[in-house]
């Protein structure tokens, strides 16, 4: 008060006004809490509701638009005559049902309901604590030494001041262990033993409920906080951070609620956070004592070939496909990285051997070439498929097995629900007697095997992981001397020794990863790009890092600013097994003009006559140290598969999914940096993309023609994808 006597009244008024106008500083944790979506505090059980057998248990219901609104009212107990422990959101009727009980309450049971989603407050059902356990509201009522707890509203045998009425919001119910003051040691209780006043309860930390093995890829525990204490963002939410790890898209990754997971091969489990300034952080989860792994978690170890994606490959191949030696995993030269033996202890990162520690498409390594960061060891053969597996003959149109999952793990959708979509892309009435339940089938005579529809709007359909029966193989040689079907209708691969081109190549695409050119591609529709699978080595890469540049001649966009179009990639669609193709769906359609155009696809199954002159395009390595960044073209002529095999000294046997082309006399052709680019041929004055550049066996080697993916063999698949996948409107 002495200050008011010393300061003139005017000065005091100005001081008070200044203090009132000062911005309020909100601590980070508190600020985060205010922005927090309360739905993160609930455990979701999809297509589930609760049925109460006890008529005395109350229920409150009201129409609301979203589950988030239901959660907000449940957490705040706003307008509810009880403490809300769970709620059900009726998606069909847009209605909330709030409960003072949950699935663990006596006289309550779960029941399937397609239109319902059950959300239970985690604090009331979790069997572990976070930090000091101040939020724990579970039902443990035994102390660490096994003594039964005294009820909180009782004074026998111990008198105390911890009455439920004095600690509202702390849930001092029954005789359950609690930590109302957030003290060290965790939840506790007064005991029923007159000799022991109180004792802590033996409730584990959530980080210790389930330990992790290896890098935690199989961790399915309940940890929902990062190692710095930040709350995890729900996997089925896109705020505050947008991401691609949607539960319906990755059903086998354990994306339950907002629990820590490791879907992309990081050193350990992590999660997106609710802090807008911190996209993601690692979680503190203890390692299992003996790092034992379930049999289902361990990839099959091989040394001479790769099984699946090669995650279990333990051989000694130590060069990438073109012979460049691998960098040691424990070295940071010439490439710095965090995929070290210390971070990936169970991935056998010995020496410089090819490995697949992060779930990429196949074994790979960092290379000793400073200009090539990563290379794939695609020269390692695939292991033979066991004849005992479920298999199909021909193209699988008569397959009648019971498999009902796609190659990406999605459950197939019932055929009867998708007949309208099926009729949209076939011109005959399918045999409904074969379309049993949701089993994999091939009603449209797809050349690449059985498939099914899914319930995922992002992936309307996909192939099933069924292989052709042993002994029933595709013909390996295509004789191009026979009458042919006309094709026309009424690390980086680079073109070596090509010449600069400014011809009309508006369909040519430069794919950028973090603003660096990595691959070529072809614009085949306004919203679709055809490129090579090797350009996207992992399904788990964030598509936000990729851009498609169109309308450019210079790979850096110099001088092309007015005509350049830069588009984001919204989705990858992987081609049939073994195709090496990828279709990219653009976030918005390209605008066709004088500088951007589409290129035609060939007729399905067509072949181009031998000695037809075609062209490959790319921005890759040119054989010169001073690469000018300009688009290059190299002219090649089509070569029959049998003759092509001879040029490769019989070491390569081509099949009908491949096409061969080589240069006449001069050393010219695609090389590192042009993956995904097109082999373009002209027939009846119509230019078409006949091939796609994929990793070969060296760059423009004399008398060694290039082998490309034959687009005509996959033309029906491309048309089917374009027809069935919805286009995002900008």
UniProtKB/Swiss-Prot annotation:
Keywords from the UniProt entry: Disulfide bond, Glycoprotein, Growth factor, Kringle, Pyrrolidone carboxylic acid, Repeat, Serine protease homolog, Signal
Cystine residue pairs: 70-96, 74-84, 128-206, 149-189, 177-201, 211-288, 232-271, 260-283, 305-383, 326-365, 354-377, 391-469, 412-452, 440-464, 487-606, 519-535, 614-681, 644-660, 671-699
Organism, scientific name: Canis lupus familiaris (Dog)
Name of the featured protein: Hepatocyte growth factor
Peptidase S1 domain mapped to chain residues: 495-723
Domain of life: Eukaryota
Domain Kringle: start-end pairs: 128-206, 211-288, 305-383, 391-469
Boundaries of every PAN domain copy: 37-123
Signal peptide stretch: 1-31
A molecular function (GO) term: chemoattractant activity
Residues listed as glycosylation sites in the UniProt record: 294, 402, 568, 655
GO cellular component: extracellular space
One Gene Ontology biological process: hepatocyte growth factor receptor signaling pathway
One Pfam family this sequence matches: Kringle
